[in-house]
Amino acid sequence: MQGLSTDGGLFVPEEIPKMTLQEIEKLIDMDYPNRTAKTLQKFLTDYTEMELGESAELAYNWFDSPSKVPLSILVKNPKNSKSPICIMELWHGPTSAFKDMALQILPRLMSLALKKVGETKEILILVATSGDSA
């Protein structure tokens, strides 16, 4: 495993997986961990559905809201729209920062990746704030 690509940049998918309208509509009724697992399945094809589901469930168990990512309605009936305008509350994780959304599942996925390639060493993930979350 390596953190940066050989050219010094970040790893990005060669192509972005497509989702049908039906697949997207199915996500609506799912809780956040299941929605996360279903979405990640499109990108992380070397993980099983069970691995992604368990990783997401464990990652987001620590959030202090039952819905994990509540929506707050800002405008109930905006002009020219059938849907309210909402904002996602991304501060319900263990550190109260939006970074919890990604950084709670990342170590679980990295540990699984190491096991899949037969690596027995432990990993350490060091995370620092960029200063945008006072």
Give the label of every model feature segment.
Residues 1-134:
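PLP-dependent amino-acid enzyme catalytic core
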